[in-house]
Amino acid sequence: MAPKGSQRVVNKVVAENRKARFNYEIIDTYEAGLVLKGTEVKSLREGKANIAESYASDEDGEIWLINSYLPEYLQANRFNHEPRRRRKLLLSGREIHRLRSAVNREGMTLVPLKIYFNDRGRAKMELALAKGKKLHDKRESEKERDWNRQKSRLLKDNG
């Protein structure tokens, strides 16, 4: 327990997949818990994680996080974890069924957006149900983003 006078960091983002919003059209987001080992939690608390190349997959009625990188905790000697191991995601049965049906039927993908600690200190992941963008859609969103930047500059200068 933290002392009474200390302030707790609420929703501290540890890792973020910034390219996901550019490469995918986000349909819906879910909050999922992570099944982690002790050294993985300590490594996350140090802020060292990478989910840029990771994805989630449905296997045997469960959702798994694959190819996420949590480096080894340096102070743990031989009881360390494997950095790129598969990690189980904790979702309700209804959410798992909804995600499985969307992925199988509509050809969507499960993309992790960010890993963070909630107000109770638990490691959570924001998981997105997404559809991949085509190349012309990516170009269009990039043009729109550049135009919005130019607009804000013009309004600021002439404001």
Swiss-Prot record:
UniProt cross-references to SUPFAM superfamilies, sorted A to Z: Small protein B (SmpB)
Segments of skewed composition (Basic and acidic residues): 137-159
GO molecular function, one term: RNA binding
BP terms from Gene Ontology: trans-translation
Pfam entry (one): SmpB
Keywords: Cytoplasm, RNA-binding
A Gene Ontology term for the protein's cellular component: cytosol
InterPro entries associated with the record: SmpB (IPR023620), SsrA-bd_prot (IPR000037), SsrA-bd_prot_CS (IPR020081)
Subcellular location: Cytoplasm
UniProt-annotated stretches for the region Disordered: 131-159
Function: Required for rescue of stalled ribosomes mediated by trans-translation. Binds to transfer-messenger RNA (tmRNA), required for stable association of tmRNA with ribosomes. tmRNA and SmpB together mimic tRNA shape, replacing the anticodon stem-loop with SmpB. tmRNA is encoded by the ssrA gene; the 2 termini fold to resemble tRNA(Ala) and it encodes a 'tag peptide', a short internal open reading frame. During trans-translation Ala-aminoacylated tmRNA acts like a tRNA, entering the A-site of stalled ribosomes, displacing the stalled mRNA.
Family under the similarity heading: Belongs to the SmpB family.
Annotated protein name in UniProt: SsrA-binding protein
Organism lineage string: Bacteria, Pseudomonadati, Pseudomonadota, Alphaproteobacteria, Hyphomicrobiales
Gene: smpB
